[in-house]
């Protein structure tokens, strides 16, 4: 059995998957915030419960935000303070007496989608998350590409390209990002960015779901806003696709629930690609909230 943990600031979620990659059991517990020992205990107790329930010693994979293993072997995850700065992989491997694998939660999202029954035909899969932030991951032949600093797929921290500034206006604000830079595309293409763009042009502080509801009702202002957003997304994504050239792009995050993102994006891409390039297949993520657990569990399918 394959055990996959999706660990965040508020919850530790475990999913148990069989050899057919089907979810057999799941359980969630709160994430301890202050005690590293309590954090380790929470993970180990879930593993022990799964071992007992299924009568086996399952493999363990963990998806967690941040950098799973820095040069000194410690975790960097500001959202999980109890474990940040600690040698999490080594400690869990020792306590559980098995090989524990860690990866970034965005890579686990992409890995989950790449192992979808329909998507396994594609050698190079790109996951793109349009949610609270913008991120993603790259999967090649069923294995995540992490890079030495685990920042492969941090698409949100690419800067706005020149074509975007031409489209939006040369006086378009280059907003300061949480990473310390200015003009990162996350500030414009995330769910928060989607709402910020609307307020910037129409001076109305609406949230993304409210804007989408107006769009669905045929509101002309909301429709013009969505057209502008999709054009901006196409410009930025065109740069990424020129570098990566994936077979498939799977879009997740809150904005992926808005059908226009996946149905209207492909037609906008050719003008931003090389003439010989082919637009990849673009799909909405298939596995929703279970994606993080799935991808973490499937870290052991990559041997």
UniProtKB/Swiss-Prot annotation:
Binding locations of ATP: 4-11, 133-140
Keywords assigned: ATP-binding, Carbohydrate metabolism, Kinase, Metal-binding, Nucleotide-binding, Transferase, Zinc
A biological process from GO: peptidoglycan turnover
GO molecular function, a single term: ATP binding
Signal peptide: none
EC nos: 2.7.1.59
InterPro entries: ATPase_NBD, N-acetyl-D-glucosamine_kinase, ROK, ROK_cs
PROSITE patterns associated with the record: ROK (PS01125)
Binding site for Zn(2+): 157, 177, 179, 184
CDD domains reported for this sequence: ASKHA_NBD_ROK_NAGK
Family of the protein in this entry: Belongs to the ROK (NagC/XylR) family. NagK subfamily.
Function recorded in the entry: Catalyzes the phosphorylation of N-acetyl-D-glucosamine (GlcNAc) derived from cell-wall degradation, yielding GlcNAc-6-P.
Stated name of the protein: N-acetyl-D-glucosamine kinase
Taxonomic source organism: Escherichia coli O7:K1 (strain IAI39 / ExPEC)
